[in-house]
Amino acid sequence: METNGNSKVFFLTKQETREDIVPERSHEGPESLYSNHWANKWKNNLNGVDINHNFPTQGWPNRADSRKRPCNEFYKGASAGSESETQYLITLVNNENFDAVLNYHTQGQIIYWSNQHASADVLAKDRAMADIVAAHTGYKLVAPEADGSKYGTGFKDWLDWEKGIPNVTVEVGIGTSPVPETQIESIWQQNTGVLPDIVKYILGK
């Protein structure tokens, strides 16, 4: 296990595979504000930037920004890749050259898998990974609308568009974030077999 700032990356070695698990990379915003009841829906980091709107894809300059300033959600930041959390993930991906990425969020029991900027090969792998997740969890597959993904600036968009790395984003939990802790056991039971089967798929087994 290595420690990087306030985050930890766990290196789990089993035969020819290694899984790097990165805990929440935008935790200081919520932790600093949860004591204020009005801010319990805070999604952005402490700078008021939505990390999932901050990745430097080709579409970032044209991405609509309804907030236009630091706030609790959706603000894309003053520049692409401006935030330390974004930079951390970019550096990690560039250094490790992952074969695939499984990205977990909380809210909705759905799986985001497609991207109109992904190559046919990456898109096919995205779909295969999504089918594996759905088989374990029963979550619904969702393809972002064309207008919504045209100028995508999230982690998934960056992986598909700029890096060509197969990936899916899995939204766990019922209701809106923060998902109640009472759901942890059911979420775990639904998802516990996902990672092993994703690894088998990537290895072609």
Each predicted region: which residue ranges?
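Active-site/substrate-binding loop(s) of hydrolase catalytic cores
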Residues: 1-115, 169-179
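Short, well-ordered coil/turn elements that cap or connect secondary structure elements
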Residues: 46, 136, 162-164
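Surface-exposed loop/turn and secondary-structure junction residues enriched for glycine/proline
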Residues: 54, 58, 114, 132, ...
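Intrinsically disordered or highly flexible coil/loop and linker segments, enriched in small
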Residues: 60-61, 142, 204
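Active-site-adjacent mobile loop/cap segments within catalytic or ligand-binding domains
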Residues: 89, 95, 100-103, 108-123, ...
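Active-site neighborhood of phospho(di)ester-bond hydrolases with catalytic His/Asp-centered motifs
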Residues: 101-104, 138-145
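Gly/Ser/Thr-rich active-site loops/lids in small-molecule metabolic enzymes
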Residues: 118-137
